[in-house]
Amino acid sequence: GYIRTFELFDRTARVEIRQPWQSGIWNGVVDGTPTKVSREGWSDTFARFAVNLVGAPPLAGKAYADYRAATHVETIVGAALSVRLPTGQYLEDKLINLGSNRFTFSPQVGVHRQYYNWSFEATGTAWIYTDNNSFFNGNQLEQDPYYTMDGSVEYKFRSGIWVSAGAGIGLGGQSAVNGVERDNRREDFGWTASAGFPVTRSLGFKVAYFETEHWAKVGIASQTVSVGLVGSW
C-alpha cells in the first residue's frame, strides 16, 4: 500500500492506495453436502482521500513534531471518501470471488479528541454499493447501504508505546437478486485491541486483534490477528 500526507488549502490531507493479495479457503454445507473451495489472487483496489476540517494544521518534519509535543488538548474533525474499485479476480460462474465486480463508495466523518496521553475517537461511515450486473450465473445483484458507527480509546506512554481498544456496530446492507429481496439484513458488532512499539524515529511495530459477531441471520463471525510495520516520512 501507499500513504501520503500533504497540505491542501491550508488543511492536512492524506491519500491512501491499497492493493491486497488474498489466499483463502471457504468451508460450508450446500444442499446437505459439506463443500470446500479455495481462491488465490488479487482482490479489489482500495483508494481513500481524507482531509481535516478542524484542528491539526498542515505541518511537516520537526514543525509537526514540535506541535504534537506542545499540544496536549485538541479536537480534530475530519471527512473522508473511500472507493473500492472492481479490479480483483472475478468469475461470473462462481459464487465466491476475491473481487466484487462493482464499485463501493464510503463517505466518512470522524471526531478525534486528545486529552494529554489519552485519545478518543468516534467515526460514522456509509457503504454505498453500485449494482453487479454480472452476478452468479448472469443474475443482477443490488444492495442497500450499510451504515457503521465506531468508537475507540487510546493511551500513549512516554516511551512511545501505545495501547488502544475500540468497538463498533453495523446495520443494513440487505440485498436483492433480480429485484427479489433476500432475508440478509445485517446487524454486526465488533471489537479490537491493539498496541504499537517504536523501532526508530520513523518506523514502528504494530500488533492488533479483531473479533466480529452478528446478531442477525447473516453476518461474519471472525477472529483476526494482525502484525505489521508502520513507517512515516
Where are these regions (language model features)?
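Transmembrane beta-barrel architecture of outer-membrane proteins
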Residues: 1, 42-46, 102-106, 146-148, ...
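N-terminal low-complexity, intrinsically disordered segments
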Residues: 1-8, 12-14
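Residues on the lipid-exposed face of transmembrane beta-strands in outer-membrane beta-barrel proteins
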Residues: 1-4, 47-53, 81, 107-113, ...
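Generic structural signal for well-ordered secondary structure
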Residues: 10, 38-42, 206, 222
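Repeated loop/turn-to-beta-strand initiation elements of outer-membrane beta-barrel proteins
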Residues: 10-13, 56-59, 117-120, 160-163, ...
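Outer-membrane pore/translocation modules
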Residues: 14, 20-142
